[in-house]
Regions:
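Predominantly soluble domains enriched in secretory-pathway, periplasmic, or organellar proteins
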Residues: 1-154
């Protein structure tokens, strides 16, 4: 849910023969919540996080990186996509390739840095964001496959 509480974005993930590669935008301002948009992101959308100011939402997609290399939809890397948020309108701003089988994503308090989990590499990708460009600037190795990530408010 956005920090303002007026819109929610959810990933669509489920068991079926194909992939559900989308996110839904939900308007929370009316009498009852309702889906107002469905957007394609990439294969197997995993997680999302709003920036602290609510102006952006970052979404992770495995994008085939957790598949066997022989699979026709295999990709070497997962994906982080950033959308700008204007009410219930989301516009894709930037994307960056990260590690394999990526999962969670979090924003820094100032909205300039993101961390994305890469389960297969036992690592977190460090990404910088300037409002237009998203790029990987480093990596933090961890002892196990990172599968849950949040920030602590201070």
């Amino acid at each position: 849910m956005s920090p303002k509480g007026d819109v929610a974005v959810v990933v669509n993930q489920g068991g079926n023969a194909g992939d559900i590669d989308t996110i839904n935008v939900i308007d929370l301002k009316g009498k009852a919540p309702r889906i107002v948009r469905t957007l394609d992101v990439g294969q197997i959308v995993e997680d999302l996080a709003f920036s602290n100011d609510g102006n952006y939402v970052a979404v992770t997609a495995q994008d085939g990186s957790a598949r066997a290399p022989s699979h026709p939809f295999y990709n070497d890397n997962g994906l982080v996509v950033v959308f700008s948020v204007n009410g219930t309108n989301l516009t894709k701003v930037a994307e960056a390739r990260v590690g394999k089988w990526n999962q969670g994503v979090v924003w820094s308090r100032d909205g300039k840095t993101l961390l994305a989990q890469n389960m297969a590499e036992n690592a977190l990708s460090i990404l910088s964001f300037d409002g237009k460009t998203l790029r990987v600037t480093g990596e933090i190795k961890v002892k196990g496959g990172p599968a849950g990530l949040r920030t602590a408010e201070r």
